[in-house]
């Protein structure tokens, strides 16, 4: 199987493209709803967008942008709408964006974003569910994030790349798409160093220019394919991946009894379907990703023995457990820990996917279930 371009990178890079006054070409984009919503968002702002979903190529001309506000109907469909605050603020000095939507997996406060904007010199207010950020001139500063927020790190990088002087971000997120967004901005002429480390340093530039850029593969999609093979048994080569980005996922699959071989841009996973119990705790990158937690739980649900899954990122990410229980799983949730007693077999059932990653996990459960999994609704 071949893995698509990264979902999380795509939405950030597309929003960052409006920082350039000349056309940008973005390649390896996945044909997913969030990208389609991003296209609608750019066109709402006045940008010209040519999007070829089959080729995964998008050209964005933001020289025609004529407004800095976004409507609620777009923002409620995509969590990443918050990235337009940083991009619009840097380019136009104003952004009016409703509080973002996205999957209901728990609190994802935007306070770290606002803190960063304010420290750069913006005035930020929230009225009737809409964020209004204004700045005549953004000025570089020293920002310490209270938690390594992916969204805040990306938003602050975008806002700071054209600020006057130098900005330092301490305790930033280190996920692969942080590095990819920084590389995209640098390809447009930004001066960002240290993405993926404990400290990011940004020297503001006057303006950014056009670029052609290909985004990294989606490590969560790759991991989901790997878990599907582990659960069903088989021998599959997963192509168009960066194995280093999958190290935590690979380690847990090996613990569970699978064999994984790594190549330059592919991984091979071999599973006989006989799985072992293990313990997993979600952590910021390079730890085990929270976006792989539901898929891991499905796998452990048919492993021998008792396993535990501890969710340390989001407090509402076990909503899928009731659905998996309908399929015969034996899972007890205590606070942020799921205690999983492996069963021999899942059985088909009518299930509801509470969020995107849970939906993928329930598909995997359906693949190994006895009988038909009738319907998976929502995302």
Kindly label every feature range from the protein language model.
Residues 1-379:
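Short, structured segments at the rim of ligand-binding sites
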């Amino acid at each position: 199987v071949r893995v698509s371009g990264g979902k999380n990178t795509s939405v950030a890079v597309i929003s960052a493209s409006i920082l350039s006054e000349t056309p940008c070409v973005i390649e390896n984009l996945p044909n997913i709803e969030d990208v389609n919503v991003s296209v609608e968002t750019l066109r709402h702002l006045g940008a010209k967008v040519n999007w070829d979903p089959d080729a995964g190529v998008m050209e964005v001309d933001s020289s025609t942008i004529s407004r800095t506000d976004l409507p609620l109907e777009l923002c409620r469909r995509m969590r990443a709408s918050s990235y337009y605050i940083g991009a619009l603020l840097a380019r136009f000095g104003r952004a009016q964006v409703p509080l973002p939507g996205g999957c209901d997996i728990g609190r994802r406060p935007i306070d770290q974003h606002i803190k960063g904007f304010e420290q750069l010199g913006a005035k930020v207010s929230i009225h009737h569910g809409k964020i209004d950020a204004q700045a005549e001139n953004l000025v570089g500063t020293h920002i310490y994030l209270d938690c390594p927020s992916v969204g805040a790190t990306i938003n602050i990088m975008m806002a700071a790349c054209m600020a006057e002087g130098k900005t330092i971000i301490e305790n930033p997120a280190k996920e692969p798409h942080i590095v990819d967004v920084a590389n995209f901005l640098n390809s447009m002429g930004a001066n960002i160093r240290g993405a993926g480390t404990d400290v990011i340093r940004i020297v503001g530039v006057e303006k950014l220019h056009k670029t052609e850029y290909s985004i990294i593969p989606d490590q969560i999609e790759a991991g989901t394919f790997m878990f599907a093979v582990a659960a069903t048994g088989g021998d599959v080569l997963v192509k168009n991946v960066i194995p280093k980005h999958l190290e935590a996922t690979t380690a847990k699959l090996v613990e569970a009894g699978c064999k994984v071989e790594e190549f330059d841009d592919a991984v091979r996973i071999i599973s006989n379907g006989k799985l072992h119990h293990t313990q997993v705790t979600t952590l910021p990158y390079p730890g085990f990703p929270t976006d792989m937690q539901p898929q891991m739980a499905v796998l452990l649900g048919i492993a021998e023995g008792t396993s535990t899954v501890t969710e340390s990122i989001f407090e509402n990410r076990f909503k899928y457990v009731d659905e998996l229980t309908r399929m015969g799983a034996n899972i007890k949730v205590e606070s942020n820990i799921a205690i999983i007693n492996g069963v021999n077999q899942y059985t088909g059932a009518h299930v509801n996917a509470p969020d995107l990653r849970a939906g993928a996990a329930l598909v995997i459960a359906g693949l190994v279930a006895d009988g038909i999994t009738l319907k998976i609704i929502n995302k």
